[in-house]
Amino acid sequence: MSVSSPAATLGVAHAHADEDVLCIPRTTIFPGNVWHGLVTRGLERVLRTIRAASEYRPRHLVEDDPSQQQVIPYCIVHHPDDDTYLITRRLRHSSERRLHNLYSLGVGGHVNPGDGERFDPVVGGLMREWQEEIVCPAPATARLVALLNEDSTPVGRVHLGLVFLVEPDAGPVAVRETHKLEGETMTLEAMRRYYLSMESWSQLCYDDLLAGAPARAERSPLVVELPPAP
């Protein structure tokens, strides 16, 4: 299955220096040894910690400050009918210059103050970013499957990923910002050739998908029903 227009990528888009973004102190989310990669257990505890200890900070103050982890809902789009996934490439017009020309499995972005007015901030941020980034005529279901931390890159050191597996009820998906992104859907086997050109987060997620993340999603502690994004 191919997407109907070029596609999206890692949720570090909308880089507005004056925006406030949801952060949590690094020492709070990692009270002991800092781990690297994906964690698939204890997600309920992580959600409780984020809800209790996070706060909004000016983005320009935390963009290069690894003591504060910017919370990023990170959506992997999966079509279960043919077992394909959305993979994208960030173009030069993308706001996140550190990720230009890299491939990604994820779509999403920062959590802003308005996201917590009607919903849990993480849920509100997820729903808003889905509407802003994706064109999807059908409803979709998002399930939290992992927490992601990656310290080997400047981008990774200041962001904390909440990885959601998102499955549309039907039909193709596309992205709105086609001047920033391009992409298509394909099987994991077909996208293997892009692995070395993927963002580090996407490499970790790719490995987890091969290890069975879709089957694990049924036990997710957080399930969000996303409305159509026409």
Language-model segments: residues:
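Short, extreme N-terminal leader segments that mark the start of a protein/domain
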Residues: 2-38
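Short hydrophobic/aromatic beta-strand or adjacent loop that forms the aromatic wall/cage
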Residues: 19-21, 72, 159-163
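Nudix hydrolase/Nudix homology domain
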Residues: 3-13, 28, 100-114, 146-230
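A short coil-to-beta-strand element that immediately follows conserved catalytic motifs
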Residues: 137-146
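Acidic, metal-coordinating catalytic segment for phosphate/diphosphate chemistry
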Residues: 36-82, 90-94
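A short catalytic or substrate-binding loop motif that flags glycine-/basic-rich loops and adjacent residues
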Residues: 15-16, 66-70, 156-158
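Conserved Nudix-box catalytic region and its N-terminal flanking loop in Nudix hydrolases
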Residues: 83-132
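Short, flexible beta-strand-to-coil junctions
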Residues: 25-29, 78-82, 168
